[in-house]
Amino acid sequence: MAKQYDSVECPFCDEVTKYEKLAKIGQGTFGEVFKAKHRQTGQKVALKKVLMENEKEGFPITALREIKILQLLKHENVVNLIEICRTKASPYNRCKGSIYLVFDFCEHDLAGLLSNVLVKFTLSEIKRVMQMLLNGLYYIHRNKILHRDMKAANVLITRDGVLKLADFGLARAFSLAKNSQPNRYTNRVVTLWYRPPELLLGERDYGPPIDLWGAGCIMAEMWTRSPIMQGNTEQHQLALISQLCGSITPEVWPNVDKYELFEKLELVKGQKRKVKDRLKAYVRDPYALDLIDKLLVLDPAQRIDSDDALNHDFFWSDPMPSDLKGMLSTHLTSMFEYLAPPRRKGSQITQQSTNQSRNPATTNQTEFERVF
């Protein structure tokens, strides 16, 4: 039995025992992540264990998709997959071997950094963070890949200050609809607090704008230090979006009434757009406010894309983007969301106050919790 299961897995992969696990740095519905080092070279890596539970026949299709995408994407601002390793099936693991994805190690994730009050980003450093994030999105979108889980915890930063988009467990290739036949992608993606309005309304023929909405949420979070819209349900999330971005109507979003959920849900009416008004207490730079405003546009067709965002005046006005290495060199401990102390959930930007909550563990968001 062990031999049969073992042959299904990864017969040409090295044993994961070539790495020594040092610490657990991530945990979620989809697996565990460990910091580790190569026993011979000392190279630091991150090991992402692929959950094989409930996989009665072969390798999980979601993991295969993630591996295929990561093998395609090679860019400075995308996490690098080094190799795939395994443990052999044996009686000691119920005849189920494990598969590990091996990545270059990154010292921090953005959620962990923002959770630490001692970490201070200057305007120049925020510009560099967003420049690298949008550069990564530009690259994956040019390669016809959607990330589909943009959030601060999935943005890694090395000790040298290089940002890497990570966790492609929900990513997929996309294409334009053909012969007037719309795509039928699942809309049950993206962590709730970062999920764009089109997905909340049931859209299944979507594209890169879903990732740009997440980029806008993350950009605002660079100042507020916590997620700006923390809904408990999909309807609550839509209400928070309406409070910040204005009511969802055909006037501001042509053909939005085509969605079946547009009539079924009790959408908030009479709300004016107040992105800049609500955020100006935190974000003092007018160019930053303007870019956030353009990223958090309700209608995905009017939302700014990564190319235009990179050309926005925010990145080309003083102070210019600056390196993160100096700031990070003053923090010797790795910072990850998983390792951050739990914080009490406070109020949100939509109620004009910040909060220090980082973990959506009490909401139905846990269904989409991701690691690495």
UniProtKB/Swiss-Prot annotation:
Q: Which GO terms describe its cellular component?
A: cyclin/CDK positive transcription elongation factor complex; cytoplasm; nucleus; P-TEFb complex; PML body; transcription elongation factor complex
Signal peptide limits:
none
Return the Pfam families for the record.
Pkinase (PF00069)
Q: Which reaction does it catalyse?
A: L-seryl-[protein] + ATP = O-phospho-L-seryl-[protein] + ADP + H(+); L-threonyl-[protein] + ATP = O-phospho-L-threonyl-[protein] + ADP + H(+); [DNA-directed RNA polymerase] + ATP = phospho-[DNA-directed RNA polymerase] + ADP + H(+)
* UniProt keyword Plastid, yes or no: no
Keyword Transcription (UniProt): yes
- Alphabetical UniProt keywords: Acetylation, ATP-binding, Cytoplasm, DNA damage, DNA repair, Kinase, Nucleotide-binding, Nucleus, Phosphoprotein, Serine/threonine-protein kinase, Transcription, Transcription regulation, Transferase, Ubl conjugation
* PROSITE patterns the UniProt entry points to: PROTEIN_KINASE_ATP, PROTEIN_KINASE_DOM, PROTEIN_KINASE_ST
Activity regulation remarks: Activation by Thr-186 phosphorylation is calcium Ca(2+) signaling pathway-dependent; actively inactivated by dephosphorylation mediated by PPP1CA, PPM1A and PPM1B. Reversibly repressed by acetylation at Lys-44 and Lys-48.
- Where composition is biased (Polar residues), the residues are 347-366
Q: Which residues carry this modification: Phosphoserine?
A: 175, 347, 353, 357
Extract the ranges annotated as region (Disordered).
Answer: 343-372
Q: Residues annotated as region T-loop?
A: 166-191
Active-site feature positions: 149
- Bilayer-crossing regions: none
Tell me which residues bind ATP. Answer: 25-33, 48, 104-106, 167
* Subunit structure of this chain's protein: Component of the super elongation complex (SEC), at least composed of EAF1, EAF2, CDK9, MLLT3/AF9, AFF (AFF1 or AFF4), the P-TEFb complex and ELL (ELL, ELL2 or ELL3). Associates with CCNT1/cyclin-T1, CCNT2/cyclin-T2 (isoform A and isoform B) or CCNK/cyclin-K to form active P-TEFb. P-TEFb forms a complex with AFF4/AF5Q31 and is part of the super elongation complex (SEC). Component of a complex which is composed of at least 5 members: HTATSF1/Tat-SF1, P-TEFb complex, RNA pol II, SUPT5H, and NCL/nucleolin.
Protein name, UniProt field = Cyclin-dependent kinase 9
Q: Identify the species of origin.
A: Rattus norvegicus
